């Protein structure tokens, strides 16, 4: 825009003062000019000075209201370059504008999305970039609205980042994902821009290339901050979560890292960016998040924008002059002539000022009217778009109906063809064929109607599209005419000001330069003629503009009718609001009355609540008394068993007694806590009732097991144990009686139960059987020796099974070979599983020793935990012995010298032995140990392999045994009866033998558990079982003393004879 650099003082003295309204008008004018110059259809980058004025305007008015008021009227749908530069300005204003700009953008998100969708459906290079850029802007707006701690410029300190991320790992995880999405949108825009540009570096020096590259400056600024924040958040996530969980995050970060590094490298090589921005360099490789110290090596990338040289500002017009209406044309011509030769009197200056003011007011009026017309036209276009969308939806529905009609028509035609094929069947099908033909004709008629309707909708749609295009063209022509008028006004203003300056100079030198003025008369006359021609052209364009203005005024009248209709609807709505207000006042009166009633009901409820509270206290006390009475009955029953002669046959081990006494002693603490809570709040007795119930059961169990343990103990310890149990029962009954009395309940002392329970615990410890006769310093060596011997026994068993496999292949064939291979393969799998279990148990044992010995040596640790060590030795011996027995039984079965049942029993014994080894290893293992998890998995595998051995043995036994059918031919009734009686006799004999064997098995198990409980030496009848002395070094089976078990009941006779077998548990 042209402006006057040297303004005379007299003109400046006549300028009006800057009121608020004038300042606002000047601000709007400056913003409109900057927006129109920044966002245009020229393929050139946005000038920084125009964008800077728009950004300063947002800070001036603390928002972007003025910007959007002008930007919403831009014809963005007519030019993809215009839309691209519009997105660029949006990005700059969002980054550097006032913070309130973000909320103004939120209201126009739908407009931004519509622009992107519009150009996304068109095959245009800039249109594709506009679609991607709008997605980036929408993502940026959503992110900053959701996280207000991050400004639109993305520049925050590490403290603010830590505060925004918080301490919740879920929030950190989600924030990282959102930043990844943000970075993806930025990188996608940069990749799309580079994809459209030529690879030559010189492209960046062309205006078309610079137009595409200019927005990437903001992308570089955003990406540098996002990269730094994602690195920080990734390190924080790796400090809270395992590495496997974040594998997807690391892969996504590495992909973005390489894309960002490539983007920065390509941008650094372009000359266009070298003078505008200093791009940081990223490291050669991505950070190693698995190493926490790598965070100290991370360097924050910093983008530097060099200070620009101050651009020469385009001066603004100090005096704005518009074209005058047609009636004032002679006045303008006369003014130009008078400015050249001077006015005849001094009053013309005032007339010229008035004329300028009138022209300015008229131009402002026309401008306001034009803005209103443009807004109305935009609204009309929006309505047309809505109608087009509705018609398109209706057209789609008609297409669906047409498709459905075609399908129905095809089905009916198919039915008609079938009916025609069946025409020879008789007159019975004649009616059906006619009905099908009628349906087909009706369907065809409906199809033709739908086709006509479809054609009509297509024509309507095309007509609406033409109208929409005509309206857009009309608006474009109107805007071009307005710009032409503005240019003409600027030319006239410049010429008038130039003439005015020359006239003033002539007036000052008129006395001595009159002749010179006469010579210039002809030149001024020519200029006047040219000005008249320009004025006539302006008049013609003004007449055309006035005709278009009349058309728009007609549309304005129509819209005014719509406004009046809306005002009538508004009045009706206001009357409805008044009615609602009256109803609301009545409702408030009624609610005040109800409020008074509710207050009375509230007082009544409070009194009822007080009664219910007292009832609750009584009920809680009743529950406590009931629980105390039940506990008293349980304890009384336990105390009565101390003198019960029927209880003399019951026995228990000291180890079990110690475990029960310790549990009862631990329950005393819970009882004390529950008693304290009940005294603090009598409304809740649940804790005291639960603790009392647990204590009564555990105390009664301790008393009963103490008496049962005394039956196997020597006389003096047994008497002391019985006396202590009686004392414990008496104190427990006294405590329960105190809890039933409300007056004595606060003075009850549950801690008095600790002394008798500790006495029982100490006596149980004294009654435990002594350890094996092994020096404690030899235990560590014995453990390693026995584990090695077990591994060697298993390896030997595997080799023997392989030898048996090869021997069976040479000596057997057919079904026997198949059975033998199946049994030996299952035994081989079992041996491999046992070997893996022994290796895992050895690893777990070493882990236990290393974690538990502290500063002590390995031998000292084994000596300190001698019983656990003895358990490991016993378990390893059992596993080795079981493997040896399994191989021997399998050898006998293959050679047809043994029984299949021996192999089944050996499989069960191996499963029990491995369970014993697992139990011995789990005693001191950490529950979170990976070796313990693998040991348990190996134990389950051993059980599965043992079950496979049993299954293969049983199936092989059934396959080999002959199952001949009985031949009843030739037998008379007498012979059949005789054989039946003989079979019954045989069954009775076998049942008696089975019963005797079960009794013998029960006796053997009873003796076995007695010997295991006392750690005794096996009898001479079992030469294959070694002495428990560890110096023997034999791999025979040790006594199984680790698993508590009760002998099974065979029949009633066995119950009467032996009673209940005691449970023995050896603690390691």
UniProtKB/Swiss-Prot annotation:
Stretches the record annotates as Important for actin binding: 867-924
Top-level taxon of origin: Eukaryota
Pfam families: ANTH, HIP1_clath_bdg, I_LWEQ
Sites bearing N-acetylmethionine, chain numbering: 1
UniProt key word Cell cycle: no
Tissue/organ expression: Widely expressed. Expressed at lower levels in skeletal muscle and heart. The level of expression does not change appreciably during development.
Gene3D superfamilies linked to this entry: 1.20.5.1700, 1.25.40.90, 6.10.250.920, I/LWEQ domain (1.20.1410.10)
Gene Ontology CC annotations of this record: apical plasma membrane; cell cortex; clathrin-coated pit; clathrin-coated vesicle; clathrin-coated vesicle membrane; cytoskeleton; cytosol; dendrite cytoplasm
Residue ranges, annotated region (Disordered): 582-610, 1011-1068
Protein name: Huntingtin-interacting protein 1-related protein
Annotated source species: Mus musculus (Mouse)
